[in-house]
Amino acid sequence: MPQSTQDNTQETRFKPRQIIDGLRRIKMVVEYDGAAFHGWQIQTNPPVPTIEAAILEAFEQITATKPKDLVAAGRTDRGVHATHMTCHLDTFAPIALNKIQTGLNRFLPDTIAVREVEEVDQNFHARYSCVGRKYTYKILNRRNRSPLYHARAEHVPHQLDLAE
């Protein structure tokens, strides 16, 4: 009886495409407050504000071109924040890396910032090269709610039973 084996290494999960001359893969680390956004991924029916759409629009502002791809290590849901979302885009635009970061941060809303930018090999893939994810869930455990934490923590006004 034939046996199948599944190998979850990067090489089997991501098949690099043919290297394209002149194409630049730009890796970015993005931080954002997702309260005003409907998640990472573009949504067109109906169109709503997303992190991906904001980055693409800002990139078009600074290069007058659309990137070939914008890929994130993961996707966040509506209202979710990120401190270190790694993503990459592919472009032929001959713009300096420091101008990409400065330009994106100039045109992005104040709730999104590009923290790091670097040019990487075309075989890097934000999703498949990712080796881990870290999530933080915050609970405000006190009687009264806090206006400072209303969108950043789950308010639990009663005593928590941590024994269960």
Q: Residue ranges of each PLM-predicted region?
A:
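Structured-RNA-binding interfaces characteristic of tRNA pseudouridine synthases
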Residues: 2, 11-164
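Intrinsic-disorder-associated, low-complexity terminal segments enriched in Asp/Asn/His/Tyr and depleted
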Residues: 7-8
